[in-house]
UniProtKB/Swiss-Prot annotation:
GO biological process, one term: virion attachment to host cell
GO cellular component: membrane; viral envelope; virion membrane
Glycosylation sites: N262
Annotated compartments: Virion membrane
Region (TM3): 293-313
Record's comment on post-translational modification: Myristoylation contributes importantly to DHBV infectivity. It is most likely required for an early step of the life cycle involving the entry or uncoating of virus particles.
Chain residues carrying a lipid of type N-myristoyl glycine: G2
Regions of this protein lying in the Cytoplasmic compartment: 2-238, 187-238, 314-330
Subunit comment: Large internal envelope protein interacts with capsid protein.
Protein task: The large envelope protein exists in two topological conformations, one which is termed 'external' or Le-HBsAg and the other 'internal' or Li-HBsAg. In its external conformation the protein attaches the virus to cell receptors and thereby initiating infection. This interaction determines the species specificity and liver tropism. The large envelope protein probably also assumes fusion between virion and host membranes. In its internal conformation the protein plays a role in virion morphogenesis and mediates the contact with the nucleocapsid like a matrix protein.
Entry comment, domain topic: The large envelope protein is synthesized with the pre-S region at the cytosolic side of the endoplasmic reticulum and, hence will be within the virion after budding. Therefore the pre-S region is not N-glycosylated. Later a post-translational translocation of N-terminal pre-S and TM1 domains occur in about 50% of proteins at the virion surface. These molecules change their topology by an unknown mechanism, resulting in exposure of pre-S region at virion surface.
Protein name: Large envelope protein
Transmembrane segments: 166-186, 239-259, 293-313
Length: 330
């Protein structure tokens, strides 16, 4: 009493599938108040519906429906049987091959195909169209005489290369000239001071190198001969001696030129060819941009102003070589 017959495995699978469909379809049917107004479903209901239908489609594509479980959604045969493949016996296969061979033999030969001819070029003639019977109109029309090309050619004027304005070149040449004059003046004064000091050291004893004009009443600190500051009476005498030494150097140089009678002899003795080769090698290493050259000279000037005497001499020689190469290049 009270006992029910045991359910078969197929029945249990069908009931399980129906329970699964009930749970999935329950989210597709809105319950209670749909929205505040009670007319339209909310976005949550729509998202649940989309997610449920995706799950149902996935299960259907994978063939996961049990037998008979799709009747809730109207799926009478969720898992259709595969179409049976035809099976050929060796005798039937041989007959089919013989029939195909006979068909190939009895088939009429193919007709020779005519090679496609190129279409004749179409030309517009005045007599082809009554509207174009007046030939003089076509001959006098500018488009008929000079037809335009298929692809229009746009002619643009050649772009002129922008040249550096003359003001910048003039300013650069002026700066280079001032720089050369400045360094030449400094080096000439330095050489003249050394020659003046050497001259004073030869003509005066070592114990009497003090300036004789510092005891004349001027409020000037003690200093050596040849180093007179501004305000000392010996300042003018110092530069007078320097001017005399400079004139003597010019006189010696003029005498050498007069004795040689030709400046080319001195240049040949100085091996001018080797110097030109050196200048050409240095010019190949220099940048071609004028702004870069200005930056290089400015950097060398800073190094010269913040370095010792030995470094100043090397930097000065480098600057003179660079400037000489620039003039040699031009």
């Amino acid at each position: 009493m009270g006992q029910q017959p045991a359910k078969s495995m197929d029945v249990r699978r069908i009931e399980g599938g129906e329970l699964l469909l009930n749970q999935l379809a329950g989210r597709m049917i809105p319950k209670g108040t749909v929205t505040w107004s009670g007319k339209f479903p909310t976005i949550d209901h729509l998202l649940d519906h989309v997610q449920t239908m995706e799950e149902v489609n996935t299960l259907q594509q994978q063939g996961a429906w049990p037998a008979g479980a799709g009747r809730r959604l109207g799926l009478t045969n969720p898992t259709p049987h595969e179409t049976p493949q035809p099976q050929w016996t060796p005798e039937e296969d041989q007959k089919a091959r013989e029939a195909f061979r006979r068909y190939q033999e009895e088939r009429p030969p193919e007709t020779t195909t005519i090679a496609p001819t190129s279409p004749t070029p179409w030309k517009l003639q005045p007599g082809d169209d009554p509207l174009l019977e007046n030939k003089s109109l076509l001959e006098t029309h500018p488009l008929y005489q000079n037809p335009e090309p298929a692809v229009p050619v746009i002619k643009t004027p050649p772009l002129k290369k922008k040249k550096m304005p003359g003001t910048f070149g003039g300013i650069l040449a002026g700066l280079i000239g001032l720089l050369v004059s400045f360094f030449l003046l400094i080096k000439i004064l330095e050489i003249l001071r050394r020659l003046d000091w050497w001259w004073i050291s030869l003509s005066s004893p070592k114990g009497k190198m003090q300036c004789a004009f510092q005891d004349t009443g001027a409020q000037i600190s003690q200093h050596y001969v040849g180093s007179c500051p501004w305000g000392c009476p010996g300042f003018l005498w110092t530069y007078l001696r320097l001017f005399i030494i400079f004139l003597l150097i010019l006189l010696v140089a003029a005498g050498l030129l007069y004795l040689t009678d030709n400046m080319s002899i001195i240049l040949e003795k100085l091996q001018w060819e080797s110097v030109s080769v050196l200048f050409s090698s240095i010019s190949s290493l220099l940048p071609s941009d004028q702004k870069s050259l200005v930056a290089l000279m400015f950097g060398l000037l800073l190094i010269w102003m913040t370095s010792s005497s030995a470094t100043q001499t090397l930097v000065t020689l480098t600057q003179l070589a660079t400037l000489s190469v620039l003039f040699y290049k031009n």
